[in-house]
């Protein structure tokens, strides 16, 4: 209900981060954020278009390589190398 009444501003920050990350991965400039509620007979599917936010993109540019490095270190500690599972 909050999303329908508040639109873009009512989207939870965790969902916004997820949408922005999806745009970072796919290099898209916009993303549909949708919510389906079968109780809303007139408009069961409600959506807004979210534009790419360059502050999020800069954060991901910095954080993702750091995460990958830490993950590789953790995997190495238990004797794994990422990608070996597909060889």
Swiss-Prot record:
The protein's name in its UniProt record: Putative uncharacterized protein ExoD
Q: Lineage of the source organism?
A: Bacteria, Pseudomonadati, Pseudomonadota, Gammaproteobacteria, Enterobacterales
Q: Which family does it belong to?
A: To bacteriophage lambda exonuclease exo.
General remark: Encoded by the cryptic lambdoid prophage DLP12.
């Amino acid at each position: 209900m909050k999303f329908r009444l508040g639109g873009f501003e009512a989207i939870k920050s965790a969902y916004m981060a997820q949408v922005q990350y999806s745009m970072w991965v796919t290099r898209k400039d916009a993303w549909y954020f949708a919510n389906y509620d079968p109780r809303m007979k007139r408009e069961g599917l409600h959506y807004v278009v979210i534009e790419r936010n360059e502050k999020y993109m800069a954060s991901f540019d910095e954080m993702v390589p750091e995460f990958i490095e830490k993950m590789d270190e953790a995997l190495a500690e238990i004797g794994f190398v990422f990608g070996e599972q597909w060889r």
